[in-house]
Amino acid sequence: MARKFPLERTRNIGIMAHIDAGKTTTTERILFYTGQTHKIGETHEGASQMDWMEQEKERGITITSAATTASWKDHRINIIDTPGHVDFTVEVERSLRVLDGSVAVFCAKGGVEPQSENVWRQAETYGVPRIAFVNKMDILGADFYNVVSMMKSRLNSNAVPMQLPIGKEDSFIGIIDLLKMDAVIYKDDLGVEMEETDIPEDMKELAAEWREKLVESVAETDEELMMKYLEGEELTIDELKVAIRKATIACEMNPVFCGTAYRNKGVQLVIDAVLDYLPAPTDIPAIKGILADGEEAERHSSDEEPFSALAFKIMTDPFVGKLAFFRVYSGTLESGSYVLNATKNKRERIGRILQMHANTREEITKVYAGDIAAAVGLKDTTTGDTLCDPANPIILESMEFPEPVISVAIEPSSKAAQEKMGIALQKLAEEDPTFTVKTDQETGQTIISGMGELHLEIIVDRLLREFKVEAKVGAPQVAYRETITQPVDVEYKYSKQSGGRGQYGHVKIRVAPQEPGEGYKFTNKTVGGSVPKEYVGPVDMGIQGAMQSGIVAGYPVVDVAVELYDGSYHEVDSSEMAFKMAGSMAFKDAMKKGNAVLLEPYFKVEVVTPEDYMGDVMGDLNSRRGLIQGMEARSGAQVINAFVPLSEMFGYSTDLRSSTQGRATYTMIFDHYEQVPASVAKKIAEGK
């Protein structure tokens, strides 16, 4: 099967936004116009093509990012629809990692909301070029210009409007194209009939003013155009388009478009913009990786290079079993062939290759560089693994995922379902790296951990629906951590003599606190073989074992740097076991001397409330040990930003609803760990 679309006519894009900005609806419309769906699905009727899990249809929110392939004007567009709820941030991270460009959808009324900020920051991290679509221009309170200024102030974005809306709210009827300087008026509800016409008289002056701003912004990104512009020469549409494309791909500019996906206005122009301004796989830098010998290497987007791909999502499909979604960075792959999972160093056979279209699938025999597809038959592959040609092994940079911050104990409603629940939880943990399952050694309970209350609710819901396991859930537990606050120097000699061969291990270590989030670091500074090489690893393992349970309240220890600088050994009695024990005991000693403290997760909370309830909301946040960061007015409501410990936020949605008669909304997202006040730490330690 030959390649249908050349690489330069391929686009891998994501649609990202805050919950309820209309992201899934926008994707639906793109699929409708590109001929992939014959009937438009409405999210609020629970009939959307992209939201295909039961819970998504019920809640009207997207949980898993479905990957879909569509074609438009001789181009192939692979679209990944990402969830907008903060508990599913990992889905967004995963999809951004394998995308080349993205459409950020903003609500014309809400503007830049917390999850939009968060997703935008993630896209910055991965260097993903973005265009913006200001959606819902037809709703009450829609304000295109306000959204553009919010993008500039809140996201630090070089937002450049490419269009202006004609009318707003109920009277939103069309769009002014600032490049062509004409207007598009929509004649029907499906947005298929549109008429290109002159700009309305009363908007000509405004359009000319914004056109000037557009040309100036574009000229600033290109020296040649700047010279022409300063000399008063007219810049052609083609020159502007080339410069906008270049600046967008370099993440120096974000072209902004507007419309209403629900009323089918402005969507085709966004699809055109995807082709015009977002990169093809050939426009982005080669992906870096590590070869078997530890050398750095690159893989270019080309069918001629050795095969390399990244698995970015694992799903359990009711019909075909385990599906691994992957992005091909280089080379080609045929179904039935063997690949090397370089991350796990295991050979895997690709049974079948499927190209997904929301919840229908098409079987294909070969994939090429730049493609996104799903493979059946990969047993050992998990999210973030590299798949490659066995003859040319390479490990591509993998993804980093945040640690879970909330845990609950879960037990099946009957003993008989215990094993079934274990298997189901294991499958769900394979799909989602931010969801973990472990057994509490002391109580024997099964503990599940995730990124928020909604995240775990959905997991429990899926257990019942997909695996028919009914489970009872305990009260949520916060993932506290421990660390030390001052550097210490300790030594420990582990020595046992009880007839026959004894045990002997002696270490001297320095333990120092690291910056929050820096994790654990171990360095070996011993000289002259005071601790033989083969015993250095066991010392490290012993320390890491001791870190699993701190001394304040038995929580894991984080953010410490350990330096092994001296020690001694015995020719006969020393063993790996002895040095592991010495490392473990030395670290426990260091915790006692290093002024150990308890840390708790703080969330960034944003509450949007009518003015009348402002005092109540702030008083309540203060009573939850919240730190108010600031307030601002936004489209007729007050927005309060605060950092609040997660332990104080359980049940907040119910309390907020009752204190504001259901008129306030809030979002929260994990931000950082901070020291727990002594009085609270004492209660936690006693309660555990």
From Swiss-Prot:
GO terms for biological process: ribosome disassembly. One of its GO terms (molecular function) is translation elongation factor activity. One of its GO terms (cellular component) is cytoplasm. It is found in: Cytoplasm. Coiled coil: none annotated. CDD domains: EF-G, EFG_III, EFG_mtEFG1_IV, EFG_mtEFG_C, EFG_mtEFG_II. Pfam families: EF-G_D2, EFG_C, EFG_III, EFG_IV, GTP_EFTU. Residues 8-282 form the tr-type G domain. GTP binds at residues 17-24, 81-85, 135-138. Belongs to the TRAFAC class translation factor GTPase superfamily. Classic translation factor GTPase family. EF-G/EF-2 subfamily. PANTHER family: RIBOSOME-RELEASING FACTOR 2, MITOCHONDRIAL, TRANSLATION ELONGATION FACTOR G-RELATED. HAMAP family: EF_G_EF_2_B (MF_00054_B). This is Elongation factor G.
